[in-house]
Amino acid sequence: MAPNIRKSHPLLKMVNNSLIDLPTPSNISAWWNFGSLLGICLVTQILTGLLLAMHYTADTNLAFSSVSHTCRNVQYGWLIRNLHANGASLFFICIYMHIGRGIYYGSYLYKETWNTGIILLLTLMATAFVGYVLPWGQMSFWGATVITNLFSAIPYIGQTLVEWAWGGFSVDNPTLTRFFALHFLLPFLIAGLTLIHLTFLHESGSNNPLGITSNCDKIPFHPYFSSKDILGFMLLYFLLTTLALFSPNLLGDPENFTPANPLVTPPHIKPEWYFLFAYAILRSIPNKLGGVLALAASILILFLSPFLHKSKQRTMTFRPLSQMLFWLLVTNLLILTWIGSQPVEHPFIIIGQLASLTYFTILLILLPLTGALENKILNY
């Protein structure tokens, strides 16, 4: 009998082992769809981004006009831009839900997969930040100024570092040029990191909602989960096209329709919605360096998740106390997101400070304690 090319060809064999004959737990729910949704988001962003880059000019005098030209004069340029801008929002919705799933079901115990995932998140955040600067509107310019300025809080080397990042003494043409270069490069780095992420995942196999070994109950990925993933793709694209066609500017800032002007500061400088929770944590500390450290800690704290797991059970499926804390954490993040969009005045300042404190308390203290408490309850 001739060998099956799908199983013998060096390249097809890799595809086969990852997407066709991959042994998959039979009971994984729709929460396990977000990994593939992130993959399709990345492909969509790279394709639309490539088409936009063909019409973009990375120059402070021309950037805003070139984006306007793309929307007005290029065939379906408006659609490509709207898909790209709103695709970023959906990318973040998917990654946050993917991380939430990881925390709820104890997926962080696959340490290598979890750590590469956090590095992917950081790279995605960097990509989104430099991309937001490119249209060179008011919020692009001032957002870039405020966020890059945070590096000046680093003792001794801070100011030098900022000027080195800017390529001058303020955000200007060199900054825009290098941000465009970075925005073009980073998605390919994300694609490479994704392969590493998947390599580590396929070493251990997928987790499942029960958090127990599923070796005795695995089914091939294709056709069962490939069809389930395609349904997810259809829903994602339906959501993306609905957003891009009916309310493309829903998640954007009206300030960005004004060309960048270094002499006029917008009344409220704020990042895109997906960074607002971190921005609220940054603003909740009245000290520059302290704020920067809290901002970094808000994401880097995820690296500690595997070490803070004290429960004998992997998932939260049968742990009602931990479930309550998890949903409290989700609610708290929504409150932080809302606070990040509000001006710095009473009562938003104190709400932001309390929400920031709660965020760190839940992750660092309450979840481990609750895990240990539930172990005790199991003995009775």
From Swiss-Prot:
Family matches, as SUPFAM superfamilies: a domain/subunit of cytochrome bc1 complex (Ubiquinol-cytochrome c reductase), Transmembrane di-heme cytochromes
Membrane topology: Multi-pass membrane protein
InterPro entries, per the entry: Cyt_b/b6_C, Cyt_b/b6_C_sf, Cyt_b/b6_N, Cytb/b6-like_sf, Cytochrome_b, Cytochrome_b_C_euk/bac, Cytochrome_b_N_euk/bac, Di-haem_cyt_TM
Keyword entries, A-Z: Electron transport, Heme, Iron, Membrane, Metal-binding, Mitochondrion, Mitochondrion inner membrane, Respiratory chain, Transmembrane, Transmembrane helix, Transport, Ubiquinone
The UniProt record lists the keyword Iron: yes
GO biological process per UniProt: mitochondrial electron transport, ubiquinol to cytochrome c
Covalent S-S links between cysteines: none
Cellular location(s): Mitochondrion inner membrane
Residues noted as binding heme b b566 in the record, renumbered to the chain: 98, 197
A family per Pfam: Cytochrome_B
GO cellular-component term (any): respiratory chain complex III
Swiss-Prot/TrEMBL cofactor(s): heme b
Record-linked PROSITE patterns: CYTB_CTER, CYTB_NTER
GO molecular function terms attached to this record: metal ion binding; ubiquinol-cytochrome-c reductase activity
Binding-site list for heme b b562: 84, 183
Ligand binding (a ubiquinone): 202
Domain of life, per lineage: Eukaryota
Transmembrane annotation, as ranges: 34-54, 78-99, 114-134, 179-199, 227-247, 289-309, 321-341, 348-368
Function: Component of the ubiquinol-cytochrome c reductase complex (complex III or cytochrome b-c1 complex) that is part of the mitochondrial respiratory chain. The b-c1 complex mediates electron transfer from ubiquinol to cytochrome c. Contributes to the generation of a proton gradient across the mitochondrial membrane that is then used for ATP synthesis.
Family statement: Belongs to the cytochrome b family.
Further information: Heme 1 (or BL or b562) is low-potential and absorbs at about 562 nm, and heme 2 (or BH or b566) is high-potential and absorbs at about 566 nm.
Name by which UniProt lists this protein: Cytochrome b
UniProt gene name: MT-CYB
